[in-house]
Regions:
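Short, flexible loop/turn motifs enriched in small residues
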Residues: 24-28
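Short beta->alpha transition motifs characteristic of CBS
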Residues: 41-48
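Residues that line or immediately flank small-molecule/substrate-binding pockets and catalytic motifs
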Residues: 48, 81, 105
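A short, polar/charged loop-to-alpha-helix boundary motif
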Residues: 50-60
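Helix-adjacent hinge/juxtasegments
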Residues: 63-96, 100
């Protein structure tokens, strides 16, 4: 497990990826995968616009990770994501074999921001609840209130 300062640094890397996602015409979400030595080994943008609504950054990253790395390796990896994974993304991270997930802002907070926007109809199903239904543990850390303003700045004007 990394320190709070390291977690924040990796979350900031995910924020940079979310900015790239917006620049590419997609939704403002991004994530990175960090191995147990603290190296970023993958990053993923959202590609909602080009992947039929299922191209969430976290699910994309989990699928890439499952193809590129062995499951034992992935148990030592942590996904850092700007916003708490939805139930689809949490399930994908679980099945990929990731060991931990760290998020900056809760899905509930995102829902407050997006309201009933048709491209982001959030569900009230925290990732901790999804992971707790599994047969193996996935460590979850978040939210990081000290990064909320920085994360939500990327969303400014996007959902209106």
């Amino acid at each position: 497990m990394f320190s709070k300062e390291q977690d924040q640094a990796f979350l900031r890397a995910a924020i940079e990826v979310s900015r790239k996602s917006v620049a590419n015409g997609n939704h403002p979400f991004g994530c990175v995968l960090v191995n147990e030595t603290g190296k970023i080994v993958l990053e993923s943008q959202n590609n909602y616009k080009t992947d039929s609504r299922l191209g969430h950054a976290e699910a994309n990253l989990a699928r890439m990770a499952a193809v590129q790395f062995e499951e034992n390796y992935l148990r030592g990896c942590t996904m850092y994501t700007t916003v708490e994974p939805c139930c689809m993304c949490a399930g994908t991270a679980y099945w990929a074999g990731l060991g931990a997930v760290v998020f900056g802002v809760t899905e509930a907070r995102l829902g407050e921001l997006t309201g009933s926007h048709p491209e982001n109809l959030t569900m009230d199903l925290p990732c901790r609840t999804v992971f707790s239904a599994g047969r193996r543990q996935v460590e979850v850390r978040g939210p990081f209130s000290e990064l909320e303003t920085e994360i939500l700045k990327v969303h400014e004007g996007f959902w209106t």
